[in-house]
Amino acid sequence: MPENSTKPKVLVADDERVIADTLAMILNQSGFQARAVYSGEKALELAPTFQPDMLISDVIMADLNGIDAAIRIRALLPSIKILLFSGQAATADLLEKAHAQGYDFEILAKPVHPQDLLSKLRGVN
């Protein structure tokens, strides 16, 4: 069995490439198998084949916001754990909309400290 098959898979989505790449690198060095994508649409496209255990996504992205991407990915992968992060105030309205639809996503504020992120991820394993 390949070594990566036992590592939790994490899909990281952020339209700021440096953030997505940095988070994926930190996660890969911390015992996860992480892939970075740069849009909500790409996350939705990759999720069925990558089969992540967890999604970490920015909320505010141009093509498909992180909450809508999370809802659509959860429909494909019902057991996926979802952690959202944002540095923008507009997030509250989007979260309220998701809560009204029965989704209870956890959110971290940007900038995300790597230790805070790892603690959250290890808590959902």
Regions found by a protein language model. Name each.
Residues 21-29:
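Charged docking surfaces used in two-component/phosphorelay signaling
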